[in-house]
């Protein structure tokens, strides 16, 4: 055992994406978290501190290291070795933004270790480059709600910090990999279908920006881009939608690629919906979440706390 000083911690919220028809462009932060505690060390080492991340690679084949190295390489710098304790309650491969949170944390890790002073736009671009789209990553980076578009040379984003809604999630204990969820989607749409699907998405975005939650819910349920094709992968979706509607929920949708199912309901009514869904779906985890205002948060240890490490 050796001693090393704690340098800083990085906390990143999880996220949901799509909200129905906002496919690959609408993301919202959720109050599940990934936390990195970073210590000075003589070699790279990652240690899991929660069951969710118990299988993470301990060395430089870790996604967090690989992403941080890409940032360092871009700036022509070399990452100093650190020991990283990793804690998370964002379940993997469940549609709650676990990979996006890790990518955002990794970018901030490089930013802090190398004192890069990256701008928000740079962070969002890097995260979107790795993820392929800005929805989950942008929500985790900034908190609140994000609507975005990633292009080859720029990422565009519109942000809404304060989202006054309760979010109840039903999390099945099986995984749905993003690749499998994308494989069930059609290669293309007819012109007529594309126009209809885009119109639904446009109204969703307008309703989100004005926080017209009944209209948001209506559009969530009218998605034509992906949910009609993914219901076969998540049989609980229609059942959750039915139970939630009886309790007055605004709308229900897959969270990202699933299998997590997300329901929006008036602030203060989420606990009642959570209890009802827990009774109806005992084989799933059911949780009441909020939409955090803050995205990634860095805290430097003011007392240079000393920890025992390997």
Curated annotation (Swiss-Prot):
Binding site for ATP: 91-101
EC code: 2.7.1.39
Pfam family, one: GHMP_kinases_N
Domain of life: Bacteria
An individual GO BP term: threonine biosynthetic process
Cited InterPro entries: GHMP_kinase_C_dom (IPR013750), GHMP_kinase_C_sf (IPR036554), GHMP_kinase_N_dom (IPR006204), GHMP_knse_ATP-bd_CS (IPR006203), Homoserine_kinase (IPR000870), Ribosomal_Su5_D2-typ_SF (IPR020568), Ribsml_uS5_D2-typ_fold_subgr (IPR014721)
Catalytic activity: L-homoserine + ATP = O-phospho-L-homoserine + ADP + H(+)
One MF term in the entry's GO annotations: homoserine kinase activity
PROSITE patterns from the UniProt entry: GHMP_KINASES_ATP
Pathway: Amino-acid biosynthesis; L-threonine biosynthesis; L-threonine from L-aspartate: step 4/5
UniProt main location, coarse: cytoplasm
This protein's UniProt keywords: Amino-acid biosynthesis, ATP-binding, Cytoplasm, Kinase, Nucleotide-binding, Threonine biosynthesis, Transferase
GO cellular component, one term: cytoplasm
Cross-referenced HAMAP family: Homoser_kinase (MF_00384)
Family: Belongs to the GHMP kinase family. Homoserine kinase subfamily.
Role of this protein: Catalyzes the ATP-dependent phosphorylation of L-homoserine to L-homoserine phosphate.
Protein name: Homoserine kinase
Gene that produces this protein: thrB
């Amino acid at each position: 055992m050796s001693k090393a000083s704690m340098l800083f911690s990085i906390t990143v919220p999880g996220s949901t994406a799509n909200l129905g028809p906002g496919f690959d462009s609408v993301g919202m932060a959720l109050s599940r978290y990934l936390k990195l505690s970073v210590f000075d060390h003589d070699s790279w080492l990652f240690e899991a501190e929660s069951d969710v991340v118990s299988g993470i690679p301990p060395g430089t084949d870790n996604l967090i290291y690989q992403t941080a190295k890409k940032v360092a390489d871009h700036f022509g710098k070399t990452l100093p070795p650190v020991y990283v304790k990793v804690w998370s309650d964002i379940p993997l491969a469940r549609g709650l933004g676990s990979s996006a949170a890790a990518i955002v944390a990794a970018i901030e890790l490089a930013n802090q270790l190398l004192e890069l002073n990256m701008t928000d736009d740079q962070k969002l671009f890097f995260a979107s480059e790795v993820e392929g789209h800005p929805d989950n990553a942008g929500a985790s980076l900034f908190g609140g709600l994000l609507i975005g578009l990633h292009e080859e040379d720029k990422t565009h984003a519109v942000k809404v910090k304060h989202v006054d809604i309760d979010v109840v999630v039903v999390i099945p204990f099986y995984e749905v990999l993003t690749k499998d969820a994308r494989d069930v989607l059609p290669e293309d749409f007819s012109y007529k279908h594309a126009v209809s699907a885009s119109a639904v998405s446009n109204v969703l975005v307008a309703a989100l920006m004005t926080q017209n939650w009944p209209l948001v819910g209506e559009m969530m349920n009218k998605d034509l881009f992906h949910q009609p094709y993914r219901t076969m992968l998540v049989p609980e979706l229609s059942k959750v939608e039915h139970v939630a509607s009886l309790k007055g929920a605004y709308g229900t949708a897959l969270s990202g690629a699933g299998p997590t199912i997300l329901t929006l309901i008036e602030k203060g009514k989420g606990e009642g919906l959570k209890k009802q869904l827990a009774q109806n779906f005992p084989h799933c985890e059911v949780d009441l979440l909020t939409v955090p205002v803050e995205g990634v948060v860095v805290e430097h240890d003011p007392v240079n706390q000393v920890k025992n490490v390997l």
